[in-house]
Amino acid sequence: MMVFAFWKVFLILNCLAGQVSMVQVTIPDTFVNVTVGSNVTLLCLYTTTEKSLEKLSIQWSFFHNKEMEEPISIYYSEGGQASAIGQFKDRIIGATNPGNASITILHMQPADSGIYICDVNNPPHFVGKNQGLLDVTVLVKPSKPFCTIQGRPEAGHPISLSCLSAFGTPSPLYYWYNIEGNTIVPVKESFNTATGVLVIGNLTNFEQGYYQCTAINSLGNSSCEIDLTSSHPEVGIIIGALVGALIGAAVIICVVYFARNKVKSKQQKNLNSSTELEPMTKVHHPQQSEAISADGVQLEGTLPSSIHAGHNTEPTTTAVLEPEYEPNPPLETTTQPDPEPEGSVPVLAPEAEIQPHPELDPETETEPEPEPEPKPEPEPEPELEPDPQSGVIIEPLSKAGEDTVKA
């Protein structure tokens, strides 16, 4: 180590210079075991040929493990002034009497296990054995081990049981037992006490039931239990949970699917109904005009037959009113005597009846709306020639809704 090499070189130089002053360090207990959480005193005694102790220095260093390259300083005292450093701050109390370089460490923890170095110097005394080493181990009771199963716990399958404690110093040994009622019996199969692994070649050849693993060291023991059966309940629980989750997901998907289809079907039905009702509101006026025009043609066609029917009787004249194209014109029945020649008979104009609107053909509800036809222009009425037998001439009236009869 570099520290030791330095002191050896320094010792050789002092010897060559003729110096004979020496410091001697003694370690009573090289190996120290301490229980976790307790206090420990690390003894380090020294002697010096120099009477004066004013320049005496004491230093403690620590190796957490042997792989550390350099030790770390945890305590230093010189001239009556002392201080603790690092993870040991406020946890170290140093001795004050001459010849004693011991320290007491409070509340030891597992991380405090390692190598401690006591180094004493009293200039000009640099010759002699001024260092001492102590190996300190913090003892920890085994923590509760973890029992696990490797392999499938089914008949005919090889499996193994393992047992491991996270903490425990010294390292615990592991033992397997079979629980039969209130009795704990060591297993017949062989197992590794250092690793805690119990190998079972064939589950059918192994007695089923509860098994216990116990971790033991010098401070105590801890145990864990495991249930080993061919039909392990944990496997059934996991399978049941998976099946239940899949069924639940399938039900939710089906409900959402049918609900969306129902909403879409209802929306489509409402859309079709509104499309069918649109042409029904636009078919009244064109058919009404056509109906009025047809009635006018029918009245016009009946005029000659009425006149010819009375040719062997007294001469009579029937006036026919042509329907107006204006909607619902008020019609009056009047008789206006015009200057007529003798022998003519006035004829009363019949009262025009307002034709009711024709009922809609049910077929038009489903047919698209017809395009409105252009309104036909009224044809000029032909002039009526006098009937040679009756001598009556029909002329249209000058006012709406009236006719004049001339003989």
UniProtKB/Swiss-Prot annotation:
Keywords: Disulfide bond, Glycoprotein, Immunoglobulin domain, Membrane, Phosphoprotein, Repeat, Signal, Transmembrane, Transmembrane helix. Residues 145-229 form the Ig-like C2-type domain. It is a single-pass type I membrane protein. The modification Phosphoserine is found at residues 273-274. One of its GO terms (biological process) is epithelial cell morphogenesis. Residues 1-22 form the signal peptide. It holds the Pfam family V-set. CDD domains: Ig. Disulfide bonds join 44-118, 163-213. Residues 23-234 are extracellular. SMART domains: IG (SM00409), IGc2 (SM00408). It is found in: Membrane. Residues 268-289, 318-407 are annotated as: Disordered. The chain crosses the membrane at residues 235-255. One of its GO terms (cellular component) is plasma membrane. Its main location: membrane. This is V-set and immunoglobulin domain-containing protein 1.
